[in-house]
Design a protein with these regions (language model features):
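Regulatory and interdomain segments flanking nucleotide-handling catalytic cores
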Residues: 1-262
Length: 262
C-alpha cells in the first residue's frame, strides 16, 4: 500500500466528520457535570457556597480561554457559554468553528479548572470531576438572549424543586418526598416548602434562585502611585436580575455595549 494513498484515505475519513459551524453566528456551548450527584455528595444541600465557588472559577477560566467568549451563566452543575465571532469582518471563530474541537476543549477546560479550584480550596469531592460539552449556533443575538432566559427559567424551577426536596428529606423518607412532589408546580412547591419547614424560598441566595454569571465589565483600578484607570475585567455576578424582565442587561453584554472601548 502506498503511504500517500493510505494517508489521504485516512485523512478523508477524518474530514467527513469534521463538522464546522456557519461563520459569523453566535455559538452556544452547554457544559454539564457528569455524575455530579455522586461527585458532590459530600457538599451541603440544597445549596453549597463551596460548589458555587468552584463553578464560578470554572466560568472565569472558560471566559479567559475560549476565543470570543462574552458571557457565561451557571446553575446547578451546568454552564452555558456564549461566544461570538462576528464583531469584525476579520474575526475568526475559535478552532475555525470545528464542533468537535470546541466541545472537547471546553469540557477539558471545565474539568481541569473545577478540579484545580477544589484542590486549592480544600473542597472534598468523590472521584474526579468530569464535564461533558455540546455546542450549537443560534441565528442572532436576540436568540442568545432567549436561550439565556430559558436557562434561567430552568434554573428557577430546578432550585425550587431542589430546595423543597432536600428540606423535606429532613422530615420524611425518599419515597414519601418523591410522591409528595410529583406533579406539583413550582408555585405549589414553594407553598409546600413554607408550610412544612417555615422557609421562604426567597430567603435563599440569589445565586441559588437565579444562577450566577461571568462577563467582562469596566472596573476602576487603583495603582500604588495613587493613580486610577478603567479597565475591562472579568467579573462574577452572583446577584443577577430576572433576565426576562431585564433584557437590556443581557443585550448590552452580548453585543459589547457594556465594554469600555480601549
Amino acid at each position: 500500500v502506498k503511504v500517500n494513498t493510505l494517508r489521504e484515505r485516512i485523512s478523508e475519513y477524518e474530514k467527513i466528520y469534521d463538522y464546522r459551524f456557519i461563520r459569523k453566528l453566535p455559538i452556544i456551548t452547554v457544559i454539564n457535570g457528569r455524575s455530579f450527584k455522586k461527585t458532590t455528595s459530600l457538599l451541603k444541600k440544597p445549596f453549597s457556597e463551596d460548589f458555587l465557588k468552584l463553578m464560578c472559577y470554572t466560568m472565569i477560566r472558560l471566559l479567559a480561554e475560549v476565543d470570543g467568549a462574552v458571557f457565561a451563566y451557571c446553575y446547578s452543575d451546568e454552564i452555558t457559554l456564549v461566544s461570538r465571532n462576528d464583531q469584525t469582518h476579520e474575526t475568526e471563530p475559535w478552532y475555525n468553528g470545528s464542533i468537535q474541537k470546541i466541545s472537547s476543549a471546553t469540557s477539558s477546560i471545565a474539568s481541569t479548572s473545577f478540579l484545580m479550584s477544589a484542590l486549592e480550596n480544600d473542597i472534598n469531592l468523590i472521584g474526579d470531576p468530569i464535564f461533558t460539552s455540546s455546542s450549537f449556533v443560534v441565528p442572532n443575538t436576540m436568540e442568545v438572549v432567549n436561550t439565556l432566559i430559558n436557562k434561567q427559567q430552568s434554573a428557577f424551577n430546578y432550585s425550587v424543586h431542589s430546595a423543597c426536596y432536600f428540606e423535606l428529606l429532613k422530615k420524611y423518607t425518599y419515597d414519601t418526598v418523591d410522591d409528595t412532589l410529583k406533579n406539583l408546580t413550582s408555585e405549589e412547591k414553594i407553598d409546600l416548602l413554607f408550610q412544612e419547614t417555615g422557609i421562604e424560598f426567597n430567603s435563599y441566595s440569589s445565586s441559588f434562585r437565579k444562577g450566577a454569571a461571568c462577563y467582562r465589565a469596566p472596573k476602576l483600578i487603583d495603582h500604588q502611585d495613587g493613580s486610577q484607570e478603567i479597565k475591562n475585567k472579568i467579573t462574577i455576578d452572583a446577584d443577577l436580575p430576572t433576565f426576562s424582565k431585564n433584557i437590556d442587561f443581557l443585550s448590552e453584554i452580548i453585543t459589547g455595549k457594556n465594554i469600555l472601548k480601549l
